[in-house]
Amino acid sequence: MIIMMNCFPCFTSQKSRNAPCTTNETNDDNVEHDEFRPPVVATTKRTEEREPAEQQPPVKTFNFRELATATKNFRQECLLGEGGFGRVYKGTLQSTGQLVAVKQLDKHGLHGNKEFLAEVLSLAKLEHPNLVKLIGYCADGDQRLLVFEYVSGGSLQDHLYEQKPGQKPMDWITRMKIAFGAAQGLDYLHDKVTPAVIYRDLKASNILLDAEFYPKLCDFGLHNLEPGTGDSLFLSSRVMDTYGYSAPEYTRGDDLTVKSDVYSFGVVLLELITGRRAIDTTKPNDEQNLVAWAQPIFKDPKRYPDMADPLLRKNFSERGLNQAVAITSMCLQEEPTARPLISDVMVALSFLSMSTEDGIPATVPMESFRDKSMSIALSRHGSCSVTPFCISRKDVGNKSSSSSDSEDEEEEKEQKAEKEEESTSKKRQEQEETATDSDDESDSNSEKDQEEEQSQLEKARESSSSSSDSGSERRSIDETNATAQSLKISYSNYSSEEEDNEKLSSKSSCKSNEESTFSRYDSGRDHDDSSRNTSMRINSLAHDDKEEDEEENHETRSYSDHDDSPRNTSMRINSLSHDDDEEEEEENHQTRLEHIHSSKSEDQSVYSDDDAGESGESSLHRIEAKEEEHISSDHD
């Protein structure tokens, strides 16, 4: 009879319909297990209203005794690790033989069962290959345990800093694949889940690796399950636990966003590149904080190879290293809005994780990145001489979460940048045109100056040739004195341009004090002529040598000042005419002396012009006059 009654739901009690299917006798009475385990018979209207609960992801419930047996009563030998949320033990389920990781949450400040189960349901919805899968839970009495899949390879921290004897270090491609997988998991939490899940505790110890180094993120979405939420003492200890990974806004007490996770991911990526811990107290004081140590290196691309992990032995593409450092530097920006989206980081790392030696190709389309600043930064890092792309604080605005607003802002920025580039290019073209015009004008002016100089030189040569033709005739003493006077005037004009007023004043005073001398020659004594002519020839030869030295000095002085100036041209012409006139004067003087000796009948006076030792012809007259006077006095 009882069996017959059990076949019909109308004879079953309400309590029996709501009874759970599992044999967990230690659960509290206020837990409604039918949310997870629907009744066997669902023919009533009440069960139809619970159809949404049937669509919940399957989450298995465990009793405490079963999990204690799986972990050997939570022995120390089964302990995998300990964090801010509690301890993690390795266990084996006796029913299936499956290896699991049992996380025993701290008992202090626990939520009620309803809140705990709501969070468990939200965790069960998060399914991704790069996330550790939640298998079940336990809520017996005051016990709160979570059961996850077991990842056999250990954590990224173990492979970077706690290598076993004989274990090979990870190569460059493996490290980039780990970074790419972690970025995929983080991108799922940020963009594929509504509302977005903020990791809050991303670090190397929370990235688990399987036997093939496939990364899986753990401890995600547990911030609401965190015991002691609201307790300032506990929160401060949590900050200390993640010190070195936490974003600057977290330490300032600001609200956390998805960009805070991007900063933590940048620290992990920097650890993969350098092989250094985020905080290492064994290093010198200026190298204990990894981010603070790396910030100056970001500005010097030549030092990028030096910051790479020595265990890599430089077995990586230099271009790929530069691009990885560029991505890291963007993730570690001080301002949250200046950091890239994790989706763009994921796309960039997808190319770096490939088995290529060229890094990210330059032909990656702009549409691959949601934020165009990432593509610009990577294109700038195509060579080894480009510094990391950094967005200034002035350009950083309050970016909205929607992609349409960010795209509009980026388009406006691009248009402004294009306009600025066009304006700068136009200015450069104008400057080049003006420079070419000025060069043409200068060339034409120089050609004109050369033509004028040549014409003046030709005129000077013509005048010198005409004067040489006329100098063949005998000129009187007055004509000779007039020529000497003209030479004195031209030379004084030249010297006035080169010397200062003091020298000119001293020269004029010297000229005023000197007097002209006259000598008379005895026409009756023939034997004196030969001695006098000999001394005069010797003096003329000495004067010629002195005059040549003075001419060379004048030429060097005239050519060293300004070659293209009209003043220099006139100085050259004066020097050339002066040289020609001096040669004519020498010839005329010799003919004049021969005429004096041949006539021997008249006394002639020679006019000497005193120029304070500056004019060669004047000094010659003074020397000759004095010698002739001395000879005449001896004969008398």
Curated annotation (Swiss-Prot):
- List, alphabetically, the PROSITE patterns matched: PROTEIN_KINASE_ATP, PROTEIN_KINASE_DOM, PROTEIN_KINASE_ST
Keyword Cytoplasm in the entry? The reply is yes
Q: Where in the cell is it found?
A: Cell membrane; Cytoplasm
Q: Which UniProt keywords apply?
A: ATP-binding, Cell membrane, Coiled coil, Cytoplasm, Kinase, Lipoprotein, Membrane, Nucleotide-binding, Phosphoprotein, Serine/threonine-protein kinase, Transferase
Residues annotated as catalytic:
201 (proton acceptor)
Residues annotated with Phosphothreonine modification: 242
Q: Which residues does this entry mark as bearing Phosphotyrosine?
A: 250
Q: Where is the signal peptide?
A: none
What ranges does the record list as Acidic residues composition bias?
Answer: 432-455
Residue spans making up a coiled coil are 403-434
Q: How is it modified after translation?
A: Palmitoylated.
Query: Among its keywords, does the record have Cytoplasm?
Result: yes
The residues that hold ATP are 80-88, 103
- Observed phenotype of the null mutant: No visible phenotype. Lip1 and lip2 double mutants have a reduced male transmission.
Q: Where is this region: Disordered?
A: 18-57, 389-636
- Which molecular-function annotations from GO does this UniProt entry contain? ATP binding; protein serine/threonine kinase activity
Q: Which Pfam families match?
A: Pkinase
Compositionally biased region (Polar residues) = 480-489, 567-576
User: Residue positions of the PTM Phosphoserine?
Assistant: 205, 236
Q: How does it assemble?
A: Interacts with PRK6.
Protein family (similarity comment): Belongs to the protein kinase superfamily. Ser/Thr protein kinase family.
Q: What does this protein do?
A: Involved in pollen tube guidance into micropyle. Participates in perception of the ovule-secreted peptide signal LURE1.
Tell me what this protein is called. Answer: Receptor-like kinase LIP1
